[in-house]
Structures are given as structure tokens and as C-alpha cells.
């Protein structure tokens, strides 16, 4: 599908035409402390696709400047997710590899009188910063000598002080209308081992300082980030200029991708996992890429969805079901269409020979003959969906089976229901039907029309299977729930597990195999599925519930 809009693409075209840059270089800079989600996919896909469109390249840089909660587990997961989406970064960098360079640039700022060591606590720094309508106050430490600042900063590096005891701040303007320019902290003390550097460092650069320097070191031309960094751009440019970086990158902000009935906050996702509301980060109800993969979404569907939503400077909300449409569009001609019965009701064909099973020809995808055919079993005992039978036909619109009525079994014969068997509670547990041998599918029979077509599986050859059906994990905030936590908005019916059957052709199914189960929806074989216990996850229904 066609891309809607992308204002950064227009900027890149102009920069190349006017000679401001010779080659487009972008980067994706995740912090390795969480799993990537669909929101990150917007940044990844646009970083790579835009650079590729102009013959440039993209780097992956791990922004590992905060040692708390960072680790190799997330590094590996992020690399795997990017490759799964279909991209290979030209280089894989780590922000921590630039610690020495960044330290030296901070020393340069001190020598230029543009940075100082401060003794104020974090709370005091906040209080001194002022408000949007009131200027900040200068720290008592702001006018320390260059010599003293150099000495104290070295002592900070040497581990002489405890966590939070001192910071290094840029010396800009405490009266600046942009609060970010009011002497921001650029180094803090953290006696926490780093996942790559170990205990070599106990001072770590802040994001606003590290990020522009990393971009400059790597030769990034267009540094794309989300819209909340819009008022940080002036600081980004200040650090690049005052640190005398030989390459000058530029920052561009775009609106976040927000989806209905979806939370993407790292804190919220971690809470869902840690408190057991989901089975893990790859629970198919989660918005993480590993979860979407497990649920059955493909890289192609996600790429098409992201590119279609485009980039703008406005935060917007997209209906989460839009993603389903791209999966349907991609899979409708390439997914095979076996039969699965999720909520089985037993059918006995009274006039079919006991102990006999015949095999009928069935198309793998009636819209794509190139996918060929398969054999399906038909016999005396069958399963159909409970929802496909009602004792008394309610109206002429009912196009399924009812008592004394006739339907076609897909790829097989007409059957007529003659009687039902009920349990002690009055529930129907078995149908007794007859079939008409003259009505075999493909025979050209036109003697009468059935009351619709339904699917089935043959009992003796059918394979038991578990079907996981998913709905939104969390509901959007409403007027009634606006004062409630997101936990209170969780959907108690977000996961429904059904026990049913699939046809025998699925005996060799493997994790991530995708199917369109006829009349049921698009499904994917779960990673925990085995030959003895088949498990299928519903990726999306056959049709969208909105349009």
C-alpha cells in the first residue's frame, strides 16, 4: 500500500539536492533495558527505509549510558528483532564505547568555562531551575574556578564521591525561556557496574549530552527522535557546537505511534510481566515485537502498516486493528486454508458405512490455485462448530445447519439433520444426519441448493488442538475510567482458550507456520506447539470489526 506522508523524506531530498549532505546516515539508538515494541518499529523502519531510499545507511547504536537495568539479554533481543523486521545495520555501536571521548569533551567544556561541578542535590537542582514563568536561580557552585572544576571532575571519575553527591552541569543560562537550557546536568555519579565496562566508570553522561556527541562521532546526518525531544533540539545543537565536534548532525522530531487499547510504556509493560498479568514479554497480547511475531504477524505486514501511517509532527492515535488489515492483505493469497473446529459438536452420518473413511480433494487456497490441493477425510463421524447448528431455523438469513434442513460440508457432500441427542441438562451433544452421495463436491450436482456451506473435520483422523483467541489486553481510558490505573482497565477476557480439532494435514506443522482456518480467521502455530499437543494462536479474525 502507498505511503501516506513523510516530511523527513522531503527534508532529506532537499539536503541532498542543495549539497548540505553527501550521503544520508541515520541511526536507531535503543536503550538496552527493555524489549522493542510496535512503537519502536516506526523508528526502525523509517530509519532504515529512508536511508536506503537515498543510497545511505543506518547504524544500530545501543544507548547504554545508564547502567541500571541494562544487559546483554536486551542487546541480543533488539538485534534479533531488527533482523526479523528485515534490516541489517551497517554498524553496531555502543554508546559506552565513547565514554572516554565524551569525558574529554566534558573537560573541554570546563576549560572553556562552560561547565561546572555542582554540590546541589537532585531535588535542589529542580527547585533552583525555576518554572515556565519564573527564571531559575544560579547554584552557589556556578562560579567555581576552572581549576577547581577540573580537579573535582577528576575526583568524581576517580570514585571519591558517593552517588548523587556531585554532578557536572553545563553553564548556559538560568534565565533561558527553555528550561532545558538552564544549566542541565551532563554527568552524574552512579556506582553501578556497567554491562560492558564493568566497574571502570562510576560517572555516566546524561542522555542530552551523550546523544548529540554520539551522533556526531558516527557521522549521522539526520537524527530522528520522537516529538517530546522537540524542545531539547536547542540543547542538542549547543553541545555539538560547544564541544567542537568536527561533524554536525541535525535532529528531527516526529509524532509517536499510539494505538488504541494498547500501552507501550516500558514501566507499564514491565509491571504487566513482573506482576503476572501476562506470561512474559512474548505473550501474544503484548505490543512487543517478539509478541507480535509469536501471535503470527509478519515483518512484511508490520512494515506496510508503519510506512502507510507515514511520519508527521503530530502525535496521533491509530486503530490497532489497522495492523490486522495488512496481515490479511498479505496472507490471503499465500496462506493455506485448512479446516479447524474450535468448538466441536459431534455429527453422526447414519447412512454412511461404519468403519469406512474416504479421502476427498480439497483446494489449499481457492483464490490461488498455485498452492495446489490436499486430501481431506470424510467418514461416519464428524465434528462441526457448535455455532453452525441451531435446532429451529430463526429466519431465512440463517445459512447454516438446523433440524430438517440441509447444508453442504465444504469439499464434501450435502448433509441433512434428522435428529439431535441431548444430555440431562438439555444441551445438544450429537447430531444425527444423512448424506447424499450424489452431491459430492466437484460432481457438478445442481439438483437443489443447500442452506449454506459449513466446514468440518473427520473424527478418527482429526488432531486435537488448543486455540488461543486474543482480544485487547487493556481498554482505552474513558470518562468513567479516567481516574483509574491502567491495571484497573485490563480486559478480563483478553485470552480465551478453546480445545478443538484440526484436519490431519496439519500434523507436521511447525512454530510460526501461518494458516487461514476456513471461516475462523488467521492463525499461527505457537512456539510451544508439539506433535502431541498442537497449539494455534489467532493472529486476527477473517474480517475487521471496524471500517
Segments from the language model and where they lie:
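N-terminal catalytic cores of NTP/NDP-binding nucleotidyl/phosphoryl-transfer enzymes
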Residues: 4-13, 17-79, 193-226
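Secondary-structure transition/capping motifs at alpha-helix termini
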Residues: 17-20, 49-57, 81-91, 216, ...
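Conserved short loop/turn motifs at secondary-structure junctions
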Residues: 29-33, 61-69, 91-100, 123, ...
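Active-site cores that bind ATP or allylic diphosphates and position pyrophosphate for catalysis
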Residues: 64-66, 72, 94, 108-269, ...
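A glycine-rich helix N-cap at a beta->alpha junction
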Residues: 74-100, 105-106, 113-116
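Long, charged, mostly alpha-helical binding arms that flank functional sites
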Residues: 247-326
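Substrate/cofactor-recognition hotspot
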Residues: 305-547
Amino acid at each position: 500500500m502507498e505511503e501516506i506522508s513523510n516530511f523527513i523524506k522531503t527534508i532529506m531530498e532537499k539536503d541532498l539536492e542543495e549539497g548540505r549532505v553527501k550521503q544520508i546516515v541515520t541511526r536507531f539508538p535503543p536503550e538496552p533495558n527493555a524489549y522493542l515494541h510496535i512503537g519502536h518499529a516506526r523508528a526502525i523502519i523509517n530509519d532504515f527505509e529512508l536511508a536506503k531510499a537515498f543510497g545511505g545507511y543506518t547504524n544500530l547504536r545501543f544507548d547504554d549510558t545508564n547502567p541500571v537495568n541494562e544487559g546483554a539479554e536486551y542487546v541480543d533481543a533488539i538485534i534479533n528483532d531488527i533482523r526479523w523486521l528485515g534490516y541489517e545495520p551497517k554498524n553496531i555501536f555502543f554508546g559506552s564505547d565513547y565514554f572516554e571521548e565524551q569525558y574529554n569533551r566534558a573537560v573541554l567544556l570546563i576549560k572553556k568555562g562552560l561547565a561546572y561541578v555542582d554540590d546541589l542535590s537532585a531535588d535542589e537542582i529542580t527547585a533552583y531551575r525555576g518554572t515556565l514563568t519564573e527564571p531559575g536561580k544560579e547554584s552557589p557552585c556556578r562560579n567555581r574556578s576552572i581549576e577547581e572544576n577540573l580537579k573535582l571532575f577528576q575526583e568524581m571519575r576517580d570514585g571519591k564521591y558517593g552517588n548523587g553527591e556531585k554532578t557536572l552541569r553545563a553553564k548556559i543560562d538560568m534565565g533561558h525561556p527553555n528550561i532545558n537550557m538552564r544549566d542541565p546536568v551532563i554527568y552524574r555519579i552512579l556506582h553501578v557496574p556497567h554491562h560492558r565496562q564493568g566497574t571502570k566508570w562510576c560517572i555516566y553522561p546524561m542522555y542530552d549530552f551523550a546523544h548529540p556527541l554520539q551522533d556526531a562521532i558516527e557521522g549521522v546526518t539526520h537524527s530522528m527522535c520522537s516529538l517530546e525531544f522537540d524542545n531539547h533540539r536547542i540543547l542538542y545543537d549547543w553541545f555539538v557546537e560547544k564541544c567542537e565536534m568536527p561533524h554536525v548532525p541535525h535532529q528531527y522530531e516526529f509524532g509517536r505511534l499510539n494505538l488504541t487499547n494498547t500501552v507501550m510504556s516500558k514501566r507499564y509493560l514491565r509491571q504487566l510481566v513482573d506482576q503476572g498479568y501476562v506470561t512474559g514479554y512474548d505473550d501474544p497480547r503484548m505490543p512487543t515485537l517478539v509478541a507480535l511475531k509469536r501471535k503470527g504477524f509478519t515483518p512484511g505486514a508490520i512494515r506496510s502498516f508503519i510506512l502507510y501511517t507515514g511520519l508527521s509532527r503530530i502525535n496521533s492515535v491509530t486503530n490497532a486493528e489497522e495492523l490486522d488489515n495488512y496481515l490479511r492483505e498479505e496472507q490471503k493469497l499465500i496462506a493455506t486454508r485448512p479446516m479447524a473446529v474450535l468448538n466441536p459438536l459431534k455429527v453422526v452420518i447414519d447412512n454412511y458405512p461404519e468403519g469406512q473413511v474416504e479421502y476427498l480433494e480439497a483446494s489449499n487456497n481457492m483464490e490461488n490455485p498455485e498452492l495446489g490441493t490436499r486430501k481431506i477425510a470424510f467418514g461416519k463421524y464428524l465434528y462441526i462448530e457448535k455455532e453452525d447448528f441451531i435446532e429451529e431455523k430463526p429466519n431465512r438469513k440463517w445459512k447454516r445447519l438446523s433440524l430438517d434442513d440441509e447444508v453442504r460440508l465444504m469439499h464434501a457432500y450435502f448433509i441433512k439433520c434428522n435428529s439431535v441427542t441431548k444430555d440431562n441438562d438439555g444441551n445438544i451433544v450429537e447430531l444425527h444426519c444423512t448424506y447424499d452421495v450424489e452431491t459430492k463436491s466437484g460432481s457438478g450436482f445442481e439438483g437443489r441448493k443447500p442452506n449454506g456451506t459449513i466446514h468440518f473435520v473427520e473424527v478418527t483422523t482429526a488432531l486435537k488442538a488448543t486455540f488461543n483467541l486474543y482480544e485487547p489486553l487493556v481498554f482505552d481510558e474513558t470518562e468513567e475510567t479516567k481516574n483509574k490505573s491502567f491495571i484497573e482497565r485490563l480486559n478480563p477476557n483478553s485470552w480465551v482458550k478453546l480445545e478443538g480439532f484440526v484436519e490431519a494435514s496439519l500434523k507436521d506443522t511447525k512454530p510460526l507456520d501461518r494458516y487461514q482456518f476456513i471461516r475462523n480467521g488467521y492463525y499461527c502455530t505457537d512456539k510451544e506447539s508439539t506433535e502431541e499437543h498442537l497449539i494455534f494462536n489467532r493472529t486476527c479474525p477473517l474480517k475487521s470489526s471496524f471500517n
